[in-house]
Amino acid sequence: MFSVESLERAELCESLLTWIQTFNVDAPCQTVEDLTNGVVMAQVLQKIDPAYFDENWLNRIKTEVGDNWRLKISNLKKILKGILDYNHEILGQQINDFTLPDVNLIGEHSDAAELGRMLQLILGCAVNCEQKQEYIQAIMMMEESVQHVVMTAIQELMSKESPVSAGNDAYVDLDRQLKKTTEELNEALSAKEEIAQRCHELDMQVAALQEEKSSLLAENQVLMERLNQSDSIEDPNSPAGRRHLQLQTQLEQLQEETFRLEAAKDDYRIRCEELEKEISELRQQNDELTTLADEAQSLKDEIDVLRHSSDKVSKLEGQVESYKKKLEDLGDLRRQVKLLEEKNTMYMQNTVSLEEELRKANAARSQLETYKRQVVELQNRLSEESKKADKLDFEYKRLKEKVDSLQKEKDRLRTERDSLKETIEELRCVQAQEGQLTTQGLMPLGSQESSDSLAAEIVTPEIREKLIRLQHENKMLKLNQEGSDNEKIALLQSLLDDANLRKNELETENRLVNQRLLEVQSQVEELQKSLQDQGSKAEDSVLLKKKLEEHLEKLHEANNELQKKRAIIEDLEPRFNNSSLKIEELQEALRKKEEEMKQMEERYKKYLEKAKSVIRTLDPKQNQGAAPEIQALKNQLQERDRLFHSLEKEYEKTKSQREMEEKYIVSAWYNMGMTLHKKAAEDRLASTGSGQSFLARQRQATSSRRSYPGHVQPATAR
C-alpha cells in the first residue's frame, strides 16, 4: 500500500481539486488560487453537513477578500477550526499524528502542499459523515489515477485518527474492524481490476486468434480449390501434399494453443467469480459494520443523555436535601401565617365597617347636596345684602362729607347773618329790607332743624329682622355640619372653596363700590360748587336741602345694614375657620389611615406569598400536600427509568431480530443466486449439442462471457 508521503503533494492537491469539483459549488474552483480564499471549502463543508456548518457559520466567511491575504488567512483559520471541531464533536475522532496545514502559506503564497493537507481534512469529513456512501460512490466514479490518490489519502488520514473517548473499547474495535474491512475492500478492488485487465488481454488474444483462424480457413479454402485443380494432396512428394501437411501441423498447433487459452480463460473466469463473491461479501460486511457504527454512535448519544439525566438527578437530590433543611423553619412560618391570618381577619372587619360607613356617607350625600344648595342661596342673598350695605356705606360717607361741608357753609352763613343784622341795626334801613333779611335768616334755622331730625331717624327694623333670621339659619346649618363629621368632609371642603370664591367676589365688589364712592364724592363736590355759585337763590337751596336729606336718609339706612352684616360676618368667620381647620385635620387623619391600611395589606400579601412558596417547596413526607411538585418530579424520574429499561430491552430484542432477518435475507439471496447461476450454466451446456463445430462452441462461450458481467452486476449492486 502507498502512503501520502511517497506521493508528490502537488499531485495530491491536483487530485483533491478534481474531487472538490464534483460538489458543483457556486464559487469557481478550477485552480489552486480559487481555493486560497476559503469560500469554496466553506461551501463544500456546508454541503457535507448542513446541520453543523449552517448559514450562520457560512456568513462568518468573508467572500469579498480580493488580494488581501490577511482576510484569506482569517477565513482559512475559521475553516480549520470548524473541521477540527466537527471531527471532535460530531465524528468523535481526534487527529493525533497528522501535520495540520499552515494557513499562512496557503493564504499568502498559495502553497499547493499545504492546500492539499487542508483538502485532505475536508475529504476525511466527507467519508465519515452521514452521507458518506454518496461521496464514496462519487469517488469510485472518478478516474483510476485520481481514485487511487484519493483512496491513499483517506487511508493515511484514517490511520492518524483516533476516537475521543479512550474508554469506549467497543467503538475502538469497531473502528479498527472498519478500517481493516476498508483495506480488504481496496485490495479486492485492485485484484478485480487486475483480473479484469487480464481477461481483457485474453479476449484480445482470442479475437486475434479467431481473426487468424478465419484468415487461415480462407486460405485453406483457396488452397483446397487449388488442390482440386492441381495434384492430389495425398501425395506427400507433391508441393500440394507438402503444403497440406504443413498446414495440418500448423492447425493442430493452433488448436492446442486454443485449448490451452480456453482452459486459462475458464480458470480466470472461475477466479473472477470467486473474487466477485468475496467483494459482495466484503460489501455486506462493510454495510453491517456501517450500521454497527451508526448504532454505536446512537448508543454513545444515549449514554451522553443518560449521563446528563444522572447529573440532573444528583442536582434534584441536593435540592431535596435543601428542602428538608428548610422544612425545619416551617413552624415559625406557620405561626407567622396564623398571625397574618388574624391580622387579615381584623383588616377585613375594618374594611367591612369602612364600607358600611361609606354606604352611609353615600346615603347622606344627597342631603348634603341639598344643604349645599341652600348655603349657596344664602350666600347669594348675603352677597346681595353686603353689596347694598357697601353701597349705602359708601353713600353715607360721601353724604357725611357733604353734610360737613354744608355745616361749614351754614356756619359761614350764620356769621354773615350776624354781620348783616349788625349792619341792619346800624343802618336802620327800610322795613321791607328788614323783612327780607329776617326771611333769609329763618331758612338756615329750618335746615338745621331738619338735619337734626335726619340724624335721629337711622333705625331699620326690617334689616335687623333679616339679619336675625340669617343668623339663626347659619347656626342651624353649622349644627348640622358639626353632626356629620366624617360624612360631610367633602361637602365642607366644597363650601370652603365656595366661601373663598365668594370672598374674592365681595372684594371685587368692594373695589367697584369704592370707585362708585369716588364718583359720588366728585358729584357732591360739584353740587357744593353749584351751591356756592347759587347761594343767592332760595329755590335752589331748598332743592339742594331736600336732596341732601334724601341722601342722608339713604346713608343712615346703608350704614345700619352694613354694621349688622359686618357683625354677622364677624360671628361667622371664627366658626368658618374652625370648621376648615377641623376638615383639614380629618382629611389628614383619613389619609394616614388609608396609607397604613395599604402598607399593612402589602406586608400581608408579601408574607402570604412567602409562606406559600416555602410550604410549596417543602418535603411531602413531613408536610403532606405542601410540595406536590417534588413528588411529581420523583414519579417522573421513576417512570423515565422504567421507560428507559423497557426501551433498552426492546432495543436489544429488535436488534437481535434484525440481525437474524438480515442473515436470513443474505443467505436466501446467495442461495438464489447460486441456483440461478447453476441453472444458467446447465442450460448453456445443454444447448451445446454434439453436432456443433468447435468454432460454434467458441462463439457461444464468447457471447456468454460478454453477457455474464451484466447478469452479475445487479446482484452485486443489490
From Swiss-Prot:
Residues 167-433, 462-667 form a coiled coil. Keywords: Acetylation, Coiled coil, Cytoplasm, Cytoskeleton, Golgi apparatus, Microtubule, Phosphoprotein, Protein transport, Transport. The modification N-acetylmethionine is found at residue 1. It is found in: Cytoplasm, Cytoskeleton; Golgi apparatus. Its main location: cytoplasm. One of its GO terms (molecular function) is identical protein binding. Residues 10-126 form the Calponin-homology (CH) domain. InterPro entries: CH_dom (IPR001715), CH_dom_sf (IPR036872), Hook_C (IPR008636), HOOK_N (IPR043936). Residues 1-164 are annotated as: Sufficient for interaction with microtubules. Residues 682-718 are annotated as: Disordered. Residues 553-718 are annotated as: Required for association with Golgi. The modification Phosphoserine is found at residues 3, 6, 238, 693, 707. Residues 556-718 are annotated as: Required for interaction with MSR1. Residues 696-707 have a biased composition (Low complexity). PROSITE patterns: CH. GO terms for cellular component: centriolar satellite; centrosome; cis-Golgi network; cytoplasm; FHF complex; microtubule; pericentriolar material. The keyword Thylakoid does not apply. Pfam families: HOOK, HOOK_N. GO terms for biological process: cytoplasmic microtubule organization; cytoskeleton-dependent intracellular transport; early endosome to late endosome transport; endosome organization; endosome to lysosome transport; Golgi localization; interkinetic nuclear migration; lysosome organization. Self-associates. Component of the FTS/Hook/FHIP complex (FHF complex), composed of AKTIP/FTS, FHIP1B, and one or more members of the Hook family of proteins HOOK1, HOOK2, and HOOK3. May interact directly with AKTIP/FTS, HOOK1 and HOOK2. Associates with several subunits of the homotypic vesicular sorting complex (the HOPS complex) including VPS16 and VPS41; these interactions may be indirect. Interacts with MSR1, and this association is stimulated by ligand binding to MSR1. Interacts with microtubules. (Microbial infection) Interacts with Salmonella typhimurium spiC. Belongs to the hook family. Acts as an adapter protein linking the dynein motor complex to various cargos and converts dynein from a non-processive to a highly processive motor in the presence of dynactin. Facilitates the interaction between dynein and dynactin and activates dynein processivity (the ability to move along a microtubule for a long distance without falling off the track). Predominantly recruits 2 dyneins, which increases both the force and speed of the microtubule motor. Component of the FTS/Hook/FHIP complex (FHF complex). This is Protein Hook homolog 3.
